[in-house]
Amino acid sequence: MQSAHYTGRFAPSPSGPLHAGSLVAAMASYLDARAHQGRWLLRMEDVDEARTVQGAAQDIAASLSQLGMHWDGPVLVQSRRQQHYQRACAQLGERVYACGCTRKEIADSRLGMAADGAAIYPGTCRSGLAAGKRAHALRVRVPEPGQALEQIDFEDRWQGWQRQHLASAVGDFVLRRADGFWAYQLAVVVDDAEQGVTHIVRGADLLGSTARQIYLQSLLGYPTPTYLHLPLVTHADGEKLSKQNGAQALNLNRSLTLLHEAARFLGLEVARVDGVAAFWELAVLAWRRRYL
């Protein structure tokens, strides 16, 4: 019997096939949902259409199925939801403004880098575009230091207590990019709210984005989910394993071995079994014992 109080999701970017790092994230989100007797959704985060690889979404879904991870309901695809993001942006009203700054101009302000690697925005276009400047992107204002919602606090189930000052850590951030694509921060907030997501389990590379997402949730009147940010699977040099730096596609002929390796990374002891279904039964129990 599924719980009406838990909805989780796995939301990969279809820029390539599943690899060891994305398997860990998928497994953890799946186990947390099933251990809570909740729903587990699948979303394809292809809002950045320039990075989308043709056929990757279908490959990811097929791989999850072969590995025994079966989602509830239809797959949500971000690239089909442009009007939803437009409506949310319009709802923010005067908090949104056009920005004509180039990446170089922002970097030249030397305010440092946000946790996601983007340069901290100095607020150049807050009071309007300078003469001769053309709008490139849309940004949302963050509060000045000391104002309500400038400091975002939340408890992460894995990483513990978190605090971020939006003004100094990121500045006014992008909602629609210069290339016309909606930014991840807005799209993920809208999708989580409209899908009723209550619990988010994902990699720690997104921990630094969470305060911005909580801020947007507050502005839009959305509930804030519970967060768990996992340690990242890395190369030997410590760099995050990703499609962009050569992570190898999973060999699904080794499905059980792959599942056991991912479980060990998550600190789970799962006895050797003969089939995928039996693995998941034991893995759900192991997750429940350790993390609930």
UniProtKB/Swiss-Prot annotation:
Binds 1 zinc ion per subunit. A motif ('KMSKS' region) lies at residues 240-244. GO terms for cellular component: cytosol. A motif ('HIGH' region) lies at residues 12-22. One of its GO terms (biological process) is glutamyl-tRNA aminoacylation. The keyword Zinc applies. Its cofactor is Zn(2+). GO terms for molecular function: ATP binding; glutamate-tRNA ligase activity; zinc ion binding. Keywords: Aminoacyl-tRNA synthetase, ATP-binding, Ligase, Metal-binding, Nucleotide-binding, Zinc. Zn(2+) binds at C99, C101, Y121, C125. Its EC number is 6.1.1.-. The keyword Glycosyltransferase does not apply. It is an enzyme of class 6 (ligase). HAMAP family: Glu_Q_tRNA_synth (MF_01428). Belongs to the class-I aminoacyl-tRNA synthetase family. GluQ subfamily. PANTHER family: GLUTAMATE--TRNA LIGASE, GLUTAMYL-Q TRNA(ASP) SYNTHETASE. This is Glutamyl-Q tRNA(Asp) synthetase. It comes from Verminephrobacter eiseniae (strain EF01-2). The gene is gluQ.
